[in-house]
Amino acid sequence: MKITGSKRLSQLGSAIFSEVADWKREVMNQGVDVIDLGIGSPDLPPSDRIIEAITEAVRNPAHYGYPTSEGSLAFREAVARWYRYRFGVELSPESEILTLMGSQDGLAHLALSLCDPGDMAIVPDPGYPIYSASLVLAGVEPYLLPLRAEHNFLPQLEDIPVDVAAKAKFILLNYPSNPLSAVADRAFFEHLITYAKKHDLLVVHDLAYSEMAFDGYRPISILEIEGAKEVAVEFHSLSKSFNMAGCRIAFLTGNAGAVNALKTLKSNIDYGVFSAIQAAGIAALEEDMAHNHSVAHVYERRRNVFISALAEAGWIIPPPKATMFIWAPIPKGWTSRQISREMLYHAGVVVIPGDAFGAEGEGFVRIALVQEEGRLLEAAKRIGDWLRTLE
């Protein structure tokens, strides 16, 4: 008997990621030293304090039973203290915070917990792939909200059709943005909350990159906006802020009803995050509150080095104000996929085609600053040398 996957699987994700992996494998098999600037996985280790906390916690026999699906009260209390410290936002650890196995866990399951098949949700294009994939899994109709350079990659909310705004259960946005590296100011979030209240719409904000901002810019939480908890939830992750991507720990905050819906779903799916990892998460948040631990300066230097080197080669890219990514407009005459493939085959550098994140991403590539400065300079040199051969 031949076993095949469900029809849903054929609608999931982009084949582009698989293509890029195949290209990389082929080039590496030829003995090429490939510099991978594709996947946004931090290359830095957690702080010594976090590693010490993990080491101590894994030696504690009490941490090897099933954890609670909503996360330990101690971790949720630490999140509440950190939100107060970082954003000036008060949260109830009991009803307004839910621990997650990484933000992707929550993002993948949110539509299942809030929507019924046939409902609609608004997601950005370009956007992080799980945003649309989660709707496919839940049988929810997506409305793709275009984010374009002429509007600084901010949505034009008034352009959303009235019937879409009326039908949609939620609108999902992400600032600072992956893949766009775009940012949004307080005025935008105030307008977004007003819009959501007008249309009885839940706002889902993905704030994974709040601690990775440059040039003095400090991203805000949407929950800072007056009345936001009536209509908004916010995802946050320890993956990028504290170099804990492999630990799989994050949290959802905000509207108690939405938090409880996801909590109810997850209580039927999993037993939550390993207790030792939650202990390390507490240590990470406490260290940040005590010493303002930040990785932003590392990525700011990498951004400066890489963009300057590419500029010398004639590829001018606007410097992003946040995230570990560069959303780079490509030279004329190429598609995103063509230039990504040729860059790998001729320069040995992996980047992700912009259309991997939606049709609106055509004309761009995403570059992840996940190599040390010397490797980034080498990547820029290789790209520049290759581009000069095309002149």
Locate predicted features.
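Conserved glycine-rich beta-strand-loop-beta hairpin in the small C-terminal domain of fold type I
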Residues: 282, 298-307, 317-329, 361
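PLP-dependent enzyme catalytic core of the Aspartate aminotransferase-like
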Residues: 81, 333, 342-352, 357-391
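Helix C-cap/helix->beta junction micro-motif
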Residues: 27-30, 138, 198-199, 313, ...
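A short helix->loop->beta-strand "cap" motif at the edges of active sites that frequently abuts
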Residues: 119, 140, 198-201, 229-230
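Conserved PLP-anchoring active-site segment centered on the Schiff-base-forming lysine
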Residues: 113-135
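N-terminal small-domain helix-loop-helix segment of the aminotransferase-like
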Residues: 2-102, 109, 284-287, 389-391
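Active-site phosphate-binding strand-loop segment of PLP-dependent enzymes
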Residues: 143, 148-216
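Conserved core segment of the aminotransferase class I/II
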Residues: 225, 229-300, 304, 308, ...
